[in-house]
Amino acid sequence: MQKLAVKIKKLENFHGDLPQYQSLGASGFDVRAQLAGPVVLNPGERAMIPTGLSFEIPLGYEIQARPRSGWAAKSGLTVLNTPGTIDADYRGEVKIIVINLGNEAVTINDQERCAQLVLAPVIQAQFELVNELSDTERGAGGFGSTGRA
């Protein structure tokens, strides 16, 4: 598996261990909530959860913040803007926007794993303005237009 150096900085609010991959084939690493006290989210509520970390991501890459499947399945908590994008030129604290999609209030505690981060390559588009686009069988159909008999 390919490895790429990514600089990581612990901020003043960080305590605990640095994130690490949990298996040889893992594509993501978990980050933990850095909280002064518990955060309670009622159904439909959202919060920004600090991770206490910032990154220096190599140009041509991004880090994506994704929900942890176990967290979502057990509690209804998920990352709101999935995947959240952390751009290569961002140097601030990574915060995770979580929302409670469940039916009961959920408490997020300090050091709880709140998201998984995945390093991913980025390709920027070079836009070309045209008057017409090529035809396809699908055309302009969208939002449920495919798969019909």
Curated annotation (Swiss-Prot):
Keyword Magnesium: yes
Pathway(s) where this gene product acts: Pyrimidine metabolism; dUMP biosynthesis; dUMP from dCTP (dUTP route): step 2/2
The enzyme's E.C. designation: 3.6.1.23
Cofactor(s) needed for function: Mg(2+)
Molecular functions (GO terms): dUTP diphosphatase activity; magnesium ion binding
Keyword Transport annotated: no
GO terms, biological process: dUMP biosynthetic process; dUTP catabolic process
Keyword set, alphabetical order: Hydrolase, Magnesium, Metal-binding, Nucleotide metabolism
Catalysed reaction, written as an equation: dUTP + H2O = dUMP + diphosphate + H(+)
Positions bound to substrate: 68-70, 81, 85-87, 95
InterPro entries attached to this UniProt entry: dUTPase, dUTPase-like, dUTPase-like_sf, dUTPase_trimeric
Function: This enzyme is involved in nucleotide metabolism: it produces dUMP, the immediate precursor of thymidine nucleotides and it decreases the intracellular concentration of dUTP so that uracil cannot be incorporated into DNA.
HAMAP family per record: dUTPase_bact
Family the entry assigns: Belongs to the dUTPase family.
NCBIfam families (UniProt xref): dut, PRK00601.1
Name by which UniProt lists this protein: Deoxyuridine 5'-triphosphate nucleotidohydrolase
Originating organism: Bdellovibrio bacteriovorus (strain ATCC 15356 / DSM 50701 / NCIMB 9529 / HD100)
